[in-house]
Amino acid sequence: MKIVTIVGARPQFIKLAPVSKEIRRHFEEIIIHTGQHYDFEMDKIFFDELEIPTPNYNLNIGSGSHGFQTGEMLKKIEEILLKEKPDLVLVYGDTNSTIAGALAGSKLNIKIAHVEAGLRSFDRKMPEEINRVLTDHISNILFTPTETADINLKNEGINSGIFNVGDVMYDSLLNALKLIEKKNFKILDELNISKKKYILATVHRAENTDIKENLENIINAFIESNEKIIFPVHPRTRKYLEKYRLFEKIKNYDNLKLISPVGYLEMIYLENNAKKILTDSGGVQKEAYFLKVPCVTLRNNTEWVETVLDGWNILVGSNKEKILENISKFNPASETYNYRFGEGNSSVKIVEVLRNL
């Protein structure tokens, strides 16, 4: 069987790594990198760290409106599918690359498999939610991470092709922890910060960066907390920090340590050694949960509802008072932890399903 895998954003590379490794033991795989966020050279550290094969095709789409990105991807992916004639198109998550790949394949009557199917935030204002729903409804094989995802699909009338395989990001995280043992990261020494004596923060979503009031609230909460906060700054976040003149303000406060974005392994290292995590990233919420690190989510909803139900993740949006309150007071009890994301063998289960098609 020939499988075309479509990715374009860094969280997808993390999901791709264990699955691709398993796929290549049994099938032919062609990887398309859409370049939705960055070109391959910018993303090369992820491919190298995670030992992902070099993509067969790099589309270099770059940034742009949702319509522009999706349309350009759709055209170029269709050309490749017509040339490669795969038996299956495999897509991950909820990006524009996901929906473009699924649409291109389905219109050519190629089977679509969706990894991370069934997730719902129930907020149709989120572009990711639209991508998730549409992709699920045109996919033939739906690989879900949780029972909640299964229920979501069935509530929407999807009753066949659902396979609960657990979460592939847990596969990646377990592998990352093994690789980190062989590394000697110096970042905490360079920042003069001890393990479990800092909070790790990430901010990148449009609702938090593009709206000045929201970004100001978040940054002011970070400053006023007086906690040591390590803050890897996403390029779009940096752009808006500079635009709103918050970048200069931050430099006056020693508790807030701004650093450049880091690779996957170093990010897991920072997450694992943080006493708490502040984020608006879906992937980081989940990694925090896997690592049993309390997470304060700078959003009003989440697709990872299990992390909230277990009491290890709390949603605060961009409300400064709520952020400050939970920086100081949010400390989940270990007995509430009820892990339900699979056993770290999701990639094996996915390939077992594909082998039995």
Curated annotation (Swiss-Prot):
Repeat recorded as keyword: no
EC number: 5.1.-.-
Keyword Isomerase assigned: yes
Record's protein name: UDP-N-acetylglucosamine 2-epimerase homolog
Membership in a protein family: Belongs to the UDP-N-acetylglucosamine 2-epimerase family.
This protein's UniProt keywords: Isomerase
EC category name: isomerase
SUPFAM superfamilies registered for this protein in UniProt: UDP-Glycosyltransferase/glycogen phosphorylase (SSF53756)
A UniProt-annotated Pfam family: Epimerase_2
